[in-house]
Amino acid sequence: MTVPESPPTSPSTSTPAPARATGSDVGRAAFVTASEIACVAGSLLGAGVFGGPPVAQSAGGALSAEATLLAPAGPAFAIWSVIYLGLAVYTVLQWLPGRLASPLHRRIGWWVGASMLLNAGWLLVVRAGWLPVSVAVILALALVLGVIVRRRAEAGPVPRADAIVVDGTVGLYVGWVSVATCANVTAWLVAAGVRPGPALAQAAAVLVLVVALAIGLVLLRVSHGNPAIALAMIWGIAWIAVGRLTGAPASAVTGVAAAVVATALVVAAVVAFARRPRHRLGGPVIG
């Protein structure tokens, strides 16, 4: 009878030795790095650094802070700086010793890279004025980020640094994109000539905000109460409230509804965070 071989162990422990990086792992990390470079270039293009108008002034201003009832006020977009910084840190983190073969990065790395390419692609199509295409791209981006959230939640234990970087960055990313998707779709419809009367427009805006709340609740559940998701959504929706209550287009109904939804997300986030297993944020943590 043949005795099964035991898995290799580390010299000082009886636990299996860490997996070794493969060519696929290196290729994945290189893909993420290339995607990060494309994402940075896209963000600079979107800001008008290479010439031409910034995103807010592209496509006839359809995505400006004053374009629709669901457009967040200008300061809301500062969150992109934090998200881009987090993506840069993730890109470096995945190359550190022991990370290339990490089960977590094997599960999410390709998806993170894809999200950065979609981000850059969205900026390009908006600059080109292709609003219908921008809707398709941002929906694909939201879907990819949702997959990352789920795969992170299903991952095994990960080092605390990885948990902080991944949960923080992806949480802010998916939370903000969820709000931005609502604004993007609304901007496309308005630009396409869908202009209902004031009462119907406000009712539709309130309905979309309720949908955003539902999305936030689902994401909180799937992510085991990742507070970064709620924080980004609260940030975006609160700035919608500010925009409607203090700027144009003015809408007290939409502004108050946005404030209520943001408050509801605060409560939901606190409850979800309090109920999460002590060892989890967006998934198990070790170290």
Regions found by a protein language model. Give the residues of each.
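N-terminal membrane topogenic signal
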Residues: 20-34, 80
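Membrane-interface capping segments at transmembrane-helix boundaries
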Residues: 96, 150-156, 269-285
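Central hydrophobic cores of alpha-helical transmembrane segments
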Residues: 228-238
